[in-house]
Amino acid sequence: MANRRSLEVSAAGGRVLAGYLTFGRRPGDSSARTSRPGPGLVVDYAPDGRAIGLEITAPSVVTLHAINEVLVALEQAPATADELAPLFVVRGGGAVVGTPG
């Protein structure tokens, strides 16, 4: 069975503050430990060692490439720009709030 992913985004005042990419969590899954594979990224692991999600704590400095390096290392399919588009929003004044590259 393929893992289903979903993206949750926290924003305030027109700015994206954080994101969480969930990897097909099972009922009752909770984070038992974390790792920090790079700046602005935190991987959550279930008690059995499975990666269950990726916290994007600094979307303004994290790139799609950096996220995909972590996903591939976790044996997850790379994300597309469309999948993560809510993280990389352009505000009304033209200021980029995230960096897709």
PLM features: residue spans?
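Intrinsically disordered terminal and processing segments
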Residues: M1-G40, A46-P47, A58-H65, A73-G101
